[in-house]
Amino acid sequence: KTSSKTLLGKMKTNPEFKIPSIGSEGFYVDSDVWYLLMRNIQNQVNTMLIGATGGGKTELVLLACKKLGISCSVYDMGSMYDPVAGLLGVHRLQKGGVSVFDYAKFTRDISKPGVVLLDELSRAPVTTNNILFPCLDSRRKLPVEIAGGEDLREIEVHPECCFVATANVGVEYTGTMSMDRALVGRFFPIELSYMPPEQENKVLVKRCGISLSDATIITKVANSLRNMYNKQEISSSISTRETLMVGDLVADGWDLVRAMELVLLPLFEGTRSDGERGIVCRVISSR
């Protein structure tokens, strides 16, 4: 039993920290994960959410920030091909040939209270690490050595700024960089797994407006394929994002089986009778 005098006890009794519900937000999160994330954000503990893609990691962080009433600046690290320009800034020529350093938005976001979300950090270029290291350790500073003249060369991270990262795991995620142990070690890891089937059923019913029987079949097929992926029988898993896609098609009038085929089959190679795609077809037909 949790004492009401501890931080966890206070959060559990405070309505402001209420766990998101399927009924109100259409979102399910394990209570331990929720309170741990809220505690870390409040205490400015760098946190990394680790789990399969499409599992709601980004949405979870946005929900937490909304509950806490703080800003959340999202950075898509997977598409940041030039980390120096994206995180520090660039020199721009003004009239008369004068060079002015244009600081990146990141430098302003870390200078104010709130959460800086490094989304899909596992897909970021390796050069990102050296830029982020001083921000994430006890220094809490961002060196901007490329700024010239009298421009500010070092930016302090605001005491109430918290870094949260998301990372996809699994060999099927193309573009995923092998994460530097020194980078991972600067974060508090929180692992997210797929939600229990009965909860995923409720999410599908709530968000898509489909029947419980259809939702149950979608979840059953998805979990069968997830189990096969865990056994390395197929090369890709099925995310909640994809089960929601199926649910939306069913809600819009597509036949349940056809909806599953349209969403799930393109994720796998082979034909309807051979290869991984054939395996998926058999799982769908044996629902």
Question: Model-flagged regions — what are they?
Answer:
Residues K1-F27, N43, P196-K202, K206-R287:
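Alpha-helical lid/collar subdomain of P-loop NTPases
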Residues K1-T216, K220:
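AAA+ P-loop NTPase catalytic core and its hallmark functional loops
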